[in-house]
Amino acid sequence: MKLYSLLSVFLVILLATSDSDAFTRNNFPKDFLFGAATSAYQWEGAVAEDGRTPSVWDTFSHTYNRGNLGNGDITSDGYHKYKEDVKLMAEMGLESFRFSISWSRLIPNGRGLINPKGLLFYKNLIKELISHGIEPHVTLYHYDLPQSLEDEYGGWINRKIIEDFTAYADVCFREFGEDVKLWTTINEATIFAIGSYDQGISPPGHCSPNKFINCTSGNSSTEPYLAGHNILLAHASASKLYKLKYKSTQKGSIGLSIFAFGLSPYTNSKDDEIATQRAKAFFYGWMLKPLVFGDYPDEMKRTVGSRLPVFSEEESEQLKGSSDFIGIIHYTTFYVTNKPSPSIFPSMNEGFFKDMGVYMISAANSSFLLWEATPWGLEGILEYIKQSYNNPPIYILENGMPMGRDSTLQDTQRIEFIQAYIGAMLNAIKNGSDTRGYFVWSMIDLYELLSGYTTSFGMYYVNFSDPGRKRTPKLSASWYTGFLNGTIDVATQDTIQLQSNISGSSSL
C-alpha cells in the first residue's frame, strides 16, 4: 500500500454534471433534514452487557452457516463510543441521525420489566444528539426481535406480535417522545418479510425447501404474506396509540419504511410495461396501498388469492392514514421484463418472486463490492409514489454505496454516488414530490447484515482489528461536511478541492 506522510490530503475532484443539475444545500428547504444512519445490532455491540438479552440476529449470526461474515457482538462499539460518534456527527454538520432501539436491550424479555441500563443508554444518546443540535430519528424495529418472543410464539407470523410490539412502542413513546419527533415503526417492511420468511437470508431464516438455501422450517408461499400482514397491523396499532395518547403533547410524526428498488421496463413493449406495473404493485403497493387506501393491490389479490390475508373493515380503516410519512430505503435499480433472464434471486418453486411473475435485470454495471449509480431510479420512485399514493411526505432513510473493506479512505466513487442521488432527489422535489429528508447509509463502518465485514458503507472508517475501534474520516465525510456547510457546490465541471484531515495514509 502506498503511504503519504502528510498531515492533510488534498484531492481534486472534477464533478461533471449538467447545468440543470447544479445544486447546493441552499436549494433545499431550511427544514429539510440531511443526516446519516445506523441500526442497533449493526452499531452498538455490547450484546451481553448491562442486561441486554439475545435478539434473533444474535442467534442467526452465531448459528446459521453464513461463511465468514461474523457477527455484531462488538461491531463498531457504539454502545461505549456513542459520545465520540455524536461529536463526529456534529463536526460533519449532520442535521439528523437515524438509529434504532434494541428491543431486547430496553425490554429484555420482550414484554414486562424495563431494563434501567438500556433505558439510560438511549436517554443519554438522545440527550447527546440534541445537545449538539442533531435531530434524532428513531426506528423502533430493525430486524432484531427479542429471541424470547421468537421462541414463545414464532414472532412476526403470529398475531400475538401486534400486542407485544404496541406495548414496546408505548414504552418508547413514553420514555423518549418528549425529545423524539420522528418515529419509524418498522424498517424496510417489504424486504424484511421477503428476506426472513421467503428467501431465508435473514432471521429467523424461514423458507420452503430448495437447493439454494438450507432452511430448517418455513413456507415461502404463505409466511411472507402473514408476516407482511402482521407488520402492517402492528404499525397501525402503534400509530393509533401514538396519535391517541402522545401526539397532541409530543407533536411528533410516525411512519413505516419500505425497501424500494427502482423499477423500469426493459423494453418499450406492452408486456414489459405491464410486468413493471405488476412489480411495483408487489414491491411498493404491498405496504403502501393499505397505508393509503386500506387494502392490498388488486394484482396481489388476484395472484396470491387465499394465501393473502384479508383486512377486516376495522383494520382497513385503522391502516388508512396511519403513516404520517413514508420511509424509502433505496440503493439500486432494475429493469423488468416478462421474458426469461437472470432474476435478482434464484428461481424457486414458490414464494413472492414466483407470484410477482417478472424477471429483473440490473440496470447498473455493478458488482457485489461496487455499485454504479442509477439516480434516475430514485427519481422514478418518488414520482410514482407522488402520483399513485397522494404525494405523502417522504424521507429517504437509507441510500449509500458499498466498497470493499480496508480499500481506501479516498472513496471518490461513494461521493459521486451520493451526490448523484441527492441531485435526483432534488429534481423530484422540484417536480412536486414532498420529500423532506435524506440519510446516508451509513454514518460509520458497521456490521452489514448480509455481507458482514466484507463490505463497508461508512463515511468514517472503523478499524475492527483495533480493540479501541478507532474511527478515521473518509473523503466522503469531508465532502458531506462541505456540502452541508455550503463550502461545496455541485456544479458544472466544478473543480472542488477537498481537504481531508487524514493523518499518515490515504490508503488502508
UniProtKB/Swiss-Prot annotation:
Residues with glycosylation annotation: N214, N219, N365, N431, N463, N485, N501
Reaction(s) catalysed (UniProt annotation): Hydrolysis of terminal, non-reducing beta-D-glucosyl residues with release of beta-D-glucose
Signal peptide range: 1-22
Pfam families: Glyco_hydro_1
Protein family membership: Belongs to the glycosyl hydrolase 1 family.
Single biological process term from Gene Ontology: anthocyanin-containing compound metabolic process
Disulfide bridge positions per record: C207-C215
EC number: 3.2.1.21
Protein name (record): Beta-glucosidase 10
High-level lineage: Eukaryota, Viridiplantae, Streptophyta, Embryophyta, Tracheophyta
Chain residues that bind a beta-D-glucoside: Q42, H142, N187, E188, Y331, E398, W441, F457
